[in-house]
């Protein structure tokens, strides 16, 4: 919940608690400092937005935004939602490297119809040292992006999907790109006890 804010038609918006951190740069003789100030917008019951600024004494000011939106109820038994999320971070001029540093992370889960579902993830960073230099973490080793279109019709026992995938590594190792993959599966029932499944890949 916002630490300082107000209520607009039952929805709260306001500043969230700031974050203060100390960290070390390889060339530093002393500890550098950072402060992150986030602001939360509760736009509507089905969408929100968070904006933040992070100032690092050694590198400069990073701008950040994250938007989330529920699109429509899913028709699946799990009762989840179709959702779109996008997050971006941008440092215009790194005072140490002189480079522009950025991160982009977006995903969507969307029921096109009650039988057709689209799933997409796109993740990218400006360079392999982004996480250690700017995010101050080295937990991420690879960034996987993919696009998958699925069809499932229980009434006809027919399923199909199209998938493509790409990977960006955070190390010096080269990433990979997966060739377009298609799959179709159909189950025929000669009788209730002996189903026959036919797959095409």
Segments (PLM) and residue ranges:
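Outer-membrane beta-barrel proteins and related beta-barrel translocases across Gram-negative bacteria
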Residues: 1-201
